[in-house]
């Protein structure tokens, strides 16, 4: 499991404002009261490496989006059942694009978009929204992809002559002059 931590006044007097995480990680700790309320039934983020922050004019004050890559370990969900039934668990990692709507006015967050991204087993990924689509950058595979809102791949690109790729972003280039 992972935690997303917002820190205010980071350069002067750092103060933790809130935490997004599975409740079990912070249970009975001094930080438990800083957890944002999770609206809905979904597995909190796991093993993410990067987060993309975005705003929208459609949102109210105090609301914003966090986009991230999430690795869902189905063994976490099955292990208790399998162990009690004497079953054998398989390595069940599945990867998803997650988009949270964070609402600081009510100290809560909810999962507003979840798209399964097949055949990615490395956690070296970055995800960002682009219109209704999603841009996925996979450093270890030296590729980036664009998916539509249904999770269908629209394009896939590879980079040659490099050991590793940096995160890839896509922007409209509006307001730029050439």
Give, region by region, the residue ranges found by the protein language model.
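Histidine-/acidic-rich catalytic cores in large beta-rich domains
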Residues: 1-178
């Amino acid at each position: 499991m992972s935690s997303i931590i917002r820190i205010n006044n980071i350069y002067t007097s750092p103060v933790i404002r809130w935490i997004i995480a599975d409740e079990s990680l912070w249970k009975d700790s001094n930080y438990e009261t800083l957890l944002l309320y999770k609206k809905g039934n979904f597995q909190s983020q796991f093993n993410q490496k990067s987060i993309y922050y975005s705003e929208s004019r459609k949102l109210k004050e105090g609301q914003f989006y966090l986009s991230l890559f999430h690795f869902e370990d189905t063994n976490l969900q099955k292990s208790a059942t399998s162990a009690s039934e004497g079953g054998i668990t398989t390595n069940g990692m599945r990867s998803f694009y997650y988009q949270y709507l964070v609402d600081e006015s009510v100290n809560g967050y909810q999962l507003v978009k979840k798209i399964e991204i097949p055949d990615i087993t490395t956690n070296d990924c970055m995800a960002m929204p682009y219109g209704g689509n999603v841009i996925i950058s996979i450093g270890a595979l030296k590729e980036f992809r664009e998916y539509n809102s249904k999770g269908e791949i629209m394009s896939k690109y590879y980079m040659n002559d490099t050991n590793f790729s940096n995160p890839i972003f896509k922007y409209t280039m509006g307001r730029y002059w050439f």
